[in-house]
């Protein structure tokens, strides 16, 4: 059924609509995921294939497809929605590649040439190489850096600043030939610009420009199985919105799509899927994980959840392209008939479906409810009370995975990982929307021959050695830049530090202009 449905999408999309998706693969760590600029992620819908593979090159997938849902009301209570469950381009998508522009600009060659492929892939190593060589005679700026969409075209009605970049001379212009470079997170990132206004607008869209940065780290711990998402929604409309809702829809397929369960953990802002039995068989052309199948989750690092849970019954009916009212109700914890979700154990209304831990029999889960496993879809939603014109809602997510034990042990470990990531995120205080957070890159950072951290990853006790560095102090900062430790190191070339009391996560050790990343496991 899964394959037949997606093939139907592919046929319809290819047959009717000119605007199609452009794809990139993010595969720097143990995850290989497909991304596009038409409102979908982790999917290859036009080929009818799942798009989130872990382990990489194994053929095993945990997510079939994902998409963005956005809704809000104006001052009179009128609803505006941009949402589609399966985005395959054209009418099958709520978002389309490129930034908001003047209405007359979308059909021009200038817009098509600039944003026909509104998706860009870049690595930290490419940036470091560019920093070291941009002043060298004969150096050619690589395409990944030269094509970075730092500035918009004013003559097309596009905002002057688009994707974040480091502006060395502070003139507001992205000039890679003069040393400017993309401002990314992670070891590798894919940046996507989309809007809900350019393709056959019906008056019900919000006028939102969506900027998504997916990024990964290659490490020796759980981050090697994690993909991060920084999402910026920019209100380019002439309206002030109220009761803003933003959701991620996910069609989970843990190998075999027909034997899964879904749950959520509001305290850790987490939605997750796990196998409904102990063996994940291959079925329907999809490879199963076999014994001890994994748990796959997604958590919101930046916002508490408004609602989360499995889509069931009429909430999950069909694959229609317009289901604005149903999507809005779901994002507000309601059924398609406007009734509120109910927790059967407490007989009270709830915003969170199956919010119990399946390892605990007295909590509300699909296990304790004796639900038959099956094909599972879910969503998690965040909210903002007010979304003014020209303002930005910035949110951060992490897609986490574990297969270290049996199917229910893996659920607990995903919950543990989510808690560790959330603690690490929150320990950094406020997180600026445009901050790279995890890596402030300069041409003198991350030089292993001059500053060495061992062991790395570490359980807490680390040994530092350095040479040819003139500095009086050693500093340790969180991934958000907050200073948490400082030590005088004058006339020293080595020291031992115990950071075992800190939350698990990523930290940066800096001596002078030299920096090393350390992972506390």
What are these regions (language model features)?
Residues 5-8, 231, 390, 519:
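Intrinsic structural disorder/low-complexity segments
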Residues 6, 444-521:
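C-terminal outer-membrane/trafficking sorting elements
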């Amino acid at each position: 059924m899964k394959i037949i449905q997606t093939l139907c999408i592919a046929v319809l999309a290819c047959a009717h609509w000119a605007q199609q998706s452009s794809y990139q693969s993010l595969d720097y760590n143990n995850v290989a995921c497909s991304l596009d600029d038409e409102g979908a992620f982790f999917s290859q819908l036009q080929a009818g294939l799942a798009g989130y593979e872990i382990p990489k090159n194994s053929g095993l997938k945990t997510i079939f497809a994902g998409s963005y849902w956005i809704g809000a009301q104006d001052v009179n209570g009128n609803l505006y929605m941009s949402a589609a469950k399966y985005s395959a381009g054209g009418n099958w998508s709520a978002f389309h590649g490129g930034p908001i522009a003047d209405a007359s600009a979308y059909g021009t060659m200038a817009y098509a040439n600039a944003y026909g492929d509104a998706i860009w892939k870049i690595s930290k190593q490419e940036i470091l190489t560019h920093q070291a060589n941009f002043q060298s005679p004969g150096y050619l700026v690589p395409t990944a850096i030269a094509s970075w969409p730092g500035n918009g075209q004013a003559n097309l009605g596009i905002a002057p600043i688009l994707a974040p970049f480091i502006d060395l001379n502070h003139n507001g212009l992205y000039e890679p030939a003069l040393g400017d470079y993309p401002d990314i997170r992670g070891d590798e990132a894919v940046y996507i610009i989309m809007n809900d206004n350019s393709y056959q607008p019906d008056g019900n869209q919000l006028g939102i420009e969506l900027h998504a940065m997916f990024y990964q780290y290659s490490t020796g711990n759980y981050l090697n199985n994690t993909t991060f998402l920084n999402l910026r929604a920019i209100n380019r409309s002439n309206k002030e919105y109220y009761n803003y809702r933003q959701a991620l829809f996910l069609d989970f397929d843990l190998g075999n799509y027909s034997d899964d369960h879904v749950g959520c953990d509001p305290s850790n802002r987490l939605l997750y899927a796990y196998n409904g039995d102990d063996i994940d068989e291959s079925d329907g052309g999809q490879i199963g994980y076999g014994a001890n199948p994994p748990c796959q989750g997604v958590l919101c690092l930046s916002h508490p959840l408004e609602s989360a849970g499995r889509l069931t019954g009429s909430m999950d009916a069909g694959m229609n392209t317009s289901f604005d009212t149903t999507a809005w109700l779901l994002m507000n914890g309601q059924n398609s008939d406007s009734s509120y979700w109910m927790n059967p154990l407490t007989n009270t209304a709830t915003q969170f479906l199956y919010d119990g831990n399946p390892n605990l029999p007295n909590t509300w889960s699909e296990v304790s409810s004796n639900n038959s496993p099956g094909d599972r879809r879910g969503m998690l939603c965040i909210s903002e009370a007010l979304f003014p014109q020209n303002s930005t809602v910035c949110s951060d997510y992490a897609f986490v995975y574990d297969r270290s034990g049996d199917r229910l042990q893996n659920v607990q470990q995903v919950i543990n990982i989510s808690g560790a990531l959330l603690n690490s995120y929150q320990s950094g205080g406020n997180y600026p929307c445009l901050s790279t957070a995890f890596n402030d890159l300069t041409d003198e950072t991350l030089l292993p021959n001059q500053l060495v951290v061992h062991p790395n990853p570490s359980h807490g006790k680390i040994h530092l050695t350095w040479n040819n560095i003139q500095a009086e102090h050693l500093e340790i900062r969180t991934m958000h830049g907050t200073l948490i430790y400082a030590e005088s190191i004058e006339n020293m070339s080595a020291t031992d530090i115990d950071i075992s009391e800190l939350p698990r996560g990523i930290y940066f050790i800096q001596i002078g202009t030299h920096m090393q990343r350390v992972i506390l496991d």
